Amino acid sequence: MISFLARIKFAPGDSAEIDESLRILATASRQEPGCVSYIPHRVEDDPDTVLFYEQYQDEKALEAHHNSKHFKEFFTSALQQKIQEPKIEKLVALI
C-alpha cells in the first residue's frame, strides 16, 4: 500500500474554480484501478490550502494515476499557475 499526503496552497480567491476542478479530479481518480482512497480536504482556517489524502494498492496504480488524462489535465490547467506552495509527503503506516 502506498499513501501520500499532498498539501497545495493556491493563490487567494479562486475557491469556486478550485473546488470544481478538484471534484472532477477526485471523481475520476477514485474510479482508477488500484486507487484505494483519494480525498481532497480544504484546511478549515486556511481556505486557500487543500490537503489530499491518497492511497494506492501499489506502484503500478500510482503510475497509472500520474499518467491518467484527468491528472495531466489538472496539472496543466490554468490552476497550475495558481499553485504557490506544493508539498508532497509519502506516508509509512505504523501498523
Model-assigned labels for residue ranges:
Residues 13-18, 31, 47, 53, ...:
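Intrinsic disorder/low-complexity signal
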Residues 2-8, 39-66:
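Short, well-ordered beta-strand segments in beta-rich or mixed alpha/beta enzyme
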Residues 13-15, 45, 61, 95:
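Generic "edge-of-domain/loop-turn" microfeature
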Residues 7-8, 69, 94-95:
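Short flexible/disordered coil segments
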Residues 2, 40-48, 76-95:
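Glycine-rich beta-strand-turn "strand-cap" elements at beta-sheet edges
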Residues 2-30:
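N-terminal first-folded block
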Residues 24, 28-36, 55-88:
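An amphipathic, aromatic/His-enriched active-site/gating alpha helix that lines ligand/cofactor pockets
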